[in-house]
Amino acid sequence: MIITTTPTIDGHQITEYKGLVFGEVVSGANFIRDFFASITDVIGGRSGAYESKLNSARQEALAELEKEAKRVGANALVGVSMEYQSMGGDKGMFIVVATGTAVVIR
């Protein structure tokens, strides 16, 4: 499946719009445990543990987005965007939301 942030796909014609689809992932981070587990990352100014969690959540959200597009009969996604929000206050939860327009191309 072609997944793009652009509204069109070069070399393909959109023949049908299936609608807006979403892929959402809620994840958590145990800040105390992860901080001590990756102290060298934090000292260096970056946290590899958190970057890894965020990357995993992003990949899961895109996989959910693709699954939803297939469910509605699409073979491509256009106008894809990603949003990140913290939630849960001091519990360290965050949500990653992928959105896009499911389309049929030829």
UniProtKB/Swiss-Prot annotation:
**InterPro entries recorded for this chain?**
UPF0145_dom_sf, UPF0145_YbjQ-like
Give the matching Pfam families.
YbjQ_1
The organism's superkingdom is given as: Bacteria
Coiled-coil regions, chain positions: none
Q: Which family does it belong to?
A: Belongs to the UPF0145 family.
Protein name as catalogued? UPF0145 protein APJL_0492
Please report the organism this UniProt entry assigns to the protein: Actinobacillus pleuropneumoniae serotype 3 (strain JL03)
